[in-house]
């Protein structure tokens, strides 16, 4: 109830706040020369794909390298926050809040940085344990009755890694004060990766029609099966809707959508009402729902592995 009350309050504040219409009016002339932000987006994409690929290779040493890469990515997020974001002073002096929920963004960044740091340490421990394993992973490209195939796994982990990079980046970009020289660059990377995530999710859905998903583990209770099914659908809906609502919000505000060095012009004219409605969805409602569902998804997977000892369920997607 507290969450619903907060979201309703945010919606009212957003609707009546004059500053809400200064969302992100990004102009072509504001971009820095050299397209550095496009190279950053490309490097994040390549690193994410390679990490997902190495994590699901046959050779155990290659999988260890993939786990180390994943740990390095977590440490990179934590280091970016601790050594860069904190130094900007934007957590103490952000862009003026549009809703009461904006005041929670510094705390969210702190939480995500600490989670990334702890996850990096945990992944290094996993890599050390993996290094003692000599088992060859016999994994086909297509899904099997009891586990996902290599294509599904690579898509799953690529999308997951990109989303974990998108979330803190999007939060930080939204608190950067207007007029900051590199504000646009953050939006270029954020929007580019958002378009890619949407494309990969659609590819994943198409692949599911060609290669049947494995059945849920038999050890799960009826309630757990229903929760897993609902969470799975909710994650797909949000992974599709968050990029789409972001594009619609940006278009209604009259700003371009960036994809590497290209700029996609708005498909329709400026609308205050459209900016409010779609901005509320993209910046508040869907992200906070994503935090809840994604957190439940991760905690549920860890519960099956560490508490219930349902190792088969965990290995459906993890090598």
Region locations from a protein language model:
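N-terminal secretory/membrane targeting signals
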Residues: 1-24
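Membrane-embedded alpha-helical bundles that constitute the cytochrome b-like, heme-associated redox core
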Residues: 22-319
């Amino acid at each position: 109830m507290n969450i619903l009350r907060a979201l309703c309050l945010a919606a009212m504040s957003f609707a009546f706040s004059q500053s809400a219409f200064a969302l992100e009016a990004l102009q072509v002339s504001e971009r820095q020369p050299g397209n550095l932000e496009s190279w950053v987006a490309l490097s994040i994409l390549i690193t994410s794909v390679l990490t997902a690929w190495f994590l699901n290779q046959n050779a155990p040493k290659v999988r260890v390298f993939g786990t180390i890469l994943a740990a390095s990515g977590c440490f990179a997020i934590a280091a970016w926050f601790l050594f860069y974001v904190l130094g900007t002073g934007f957590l103490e002096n952000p862009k003026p809040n549009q809703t009461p929920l904006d005041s929670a963004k510094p705390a969210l960044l702190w939480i995500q940085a600490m989670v990334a740091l702890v996850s990096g340490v945990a992944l290094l421990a996993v890599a050390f344990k993996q290094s003692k394993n000599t088992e060859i992973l016999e994994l086909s490209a297509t899904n099997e009755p009891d586990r996902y195939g290599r294509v599904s796994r690579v898509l799953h982990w690529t999308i997951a890694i990109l989303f974990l990079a998108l979330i803190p980046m999007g939060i930080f970009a939204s608190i950067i004060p207007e007029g900051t020289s590199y504000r646009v660059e953050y939006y270029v990377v954020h929007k580019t990766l958002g378009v890619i995530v949407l494309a990969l999710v659609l590819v994943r859905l198409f692949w599911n029609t060609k290669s049947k998903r494995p059945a849920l583990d038999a050890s799960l209770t009826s309630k757990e099966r229903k929760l897993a099914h609902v969470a799975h659908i909710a994650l797909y809906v949000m992974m599709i809707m968050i990029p789409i609502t972001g594009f619609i919000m940006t278009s209604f505000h009259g700003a371009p959508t960036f994809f590497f060095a290209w700029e996609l012009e708005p498909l329709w004219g400026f609308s205050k009402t459209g900016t409010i409605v779609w901005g509320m969805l993209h910046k508040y409602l869907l992200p906070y729902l994503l935090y809840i569902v994604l957190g439940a998804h991760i905690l549920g997977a860890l519960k099956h592995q560490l508490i219930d000892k349902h190792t088969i369920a965990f290995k459906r997607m993890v090598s």
